[in-house]
Amino acid sequence: MPEVSNGRRPSVATFLRQFASTIIPLVNVKQSMPTTQINIVLAEPRCMAGEFFNAKVLLDSSDPDTVVHSFCAEIKGIGRTGWVNIHTDKIFETEKTYIDTQVQLCDSGTCLPVGKHQFPVQIRIPLNCPSSYESQFGSIRYQMKVELRASTDQASCSEVFPLVILTRSFFDDVPLNAMSPIDFKDEVDFTCCTLPFGCVSLNMSLTRTAFRIGESIEAVVTINNRTRKGLKEVALQLIMKTQFEARSRYEHVNEKKLAEQLIEMVPLGAVKSRCRMEFEKCLLRIPDAAPPTQNYNRGAGESSIIAIHYVLKLTALPGIECEIPLIVTSCGYMDPHKQAAFQHHLNRSKAKVSKTEQQQRKTRNIVEENPYFR
């Protein structure tokens, strides 16, 4: 507080001059620019659990006097679930660490010359790591943090890079009947005031119920509508069901929440009353970025906070809904010879189907072009 002369308070101009004399030297201080930049190059866009994660850390330095105090790469994988129960206002949240490891990229005291430098990184991902996943009620995130502590603040820096991890699963892990053809049949009775109004018969045929990510599911749907009303908005859907589990903060009580996500849908149109229709070659593709089925065959009692399942659902109005559970793996067969034979069998089946269709098209064209049949 400046001294008061003659009992008078200092003017506003005096305060402004004092403030300017204090702040101007701070503004004139030149901000130093960083002298290092960090980036990474991945060997693959995603890594499989149980395998080695390989990457290269790229360091670009413009300061010849940079001395490394510590230079490390840290990989973390954390799963989190959480929500608020709207009825009880209880908060449920759970956190689980799947991987937390750190490696040194170079020794302390190393002098980095000007230029670009590469540091290889190889870390084994645990076999039980679940797939990367993002949703409203939970997530499984993996990240790689590269931190450089150097002799100067301008040379010290850190960067965080997200990683994509995929659960390791094969066709060898699924039950044998999942690789066999299946015919799913169901009937829906419509009654009103105990009076029968007819029945709708549903039939879905699949070559198998186990697929790997990136494959297409081919289904044949047959609907026999024996009612007096037509069916509307008939559709075949590929649904991913996710079950989350979290624990309350104070009572330590577990609660589960189920969410559904539409992956792909094939609209089939409508089915008239007292009519039988067959829909062939309904193709639904499993995206390459979709996580495989998770926690479907663990028999050791280990529970996952995020479990992922897939179903093939047939829906129609009014009130028709039926599901076939599916298994989605990240890989085919573990044995490469067995996988090659399986792929050869699929190619032969597709070739036979395409040849039959071609013959049918030729026969139809000959009949249509013959003037005798016009």
UniProtKB/Swiss-Prot annotation:
Signal peptide: none annotated. GO terms for cellular component: cytoplasm; striated muscle dense body. InterPro entries: Arrestin-like_C (IPR014752), Arrestin-like_N (IPR011021), Arrestin_C-like (IPR011022), Arrestin_domain-protein (IPR050357), Ig_E-set (IPR014756). One of its GO terms (biological process) is protein transport. Residues 344-374 are annotated as: Disordered. It comes from the Eukaryota. Belongs to the arrestin family. This is Arrestin domain-containing protein 15.
